[in-house]
Amino acid sequence: MGVEIERKFLVKGTDWKKEAKGQFYQQGYLSSHPERTVRVRRVEDKGYITIKGKSLGASRAEYEYEIPSSEVLELLHLCEQPIIEKVRYQVEYEGLVWEVDEFQGANSGLVVAEVELADEHQDVRLPAWVDQEVTQEIKYYNSQLIKHPFSQWAISPK
């Protein structure tokens, strides 16, 4: 079984963007239940399908498979709407790679950073541009942003 261990944070400012290159992502959900999601993702000319289990702390079961690019567009049309669109940047800091997602569309204005860890107790030095931790807050799951987009939140994060 594949296990993903990651922590998620809000991002402040744009200092992280200075040396980062971004890739455009489109992703949708065939199932968006927080305890089990089935995600379809397009990254440039590649496609992926990912199955994720229930989160236990910062860990969850994850299985990801590459799918033909010809099928990813068809599968995205079958997904719950709207599709998530974002630019993902990779930023190295203190020996770890941080993935910073800058959302577009109905989630424009939301920027989050995720870092994958070897284990839940791994020490992590936080970059100055990292703000509040939101690892356990379901509303920040991409699968929930399709149902409750950031633009519709009554109170926006910092």
Where are these regions (language model features)?
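Phosphate-end processing signature that detects enzymes handling 5′-triphosphorylated RNA
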Residues: M1-K158
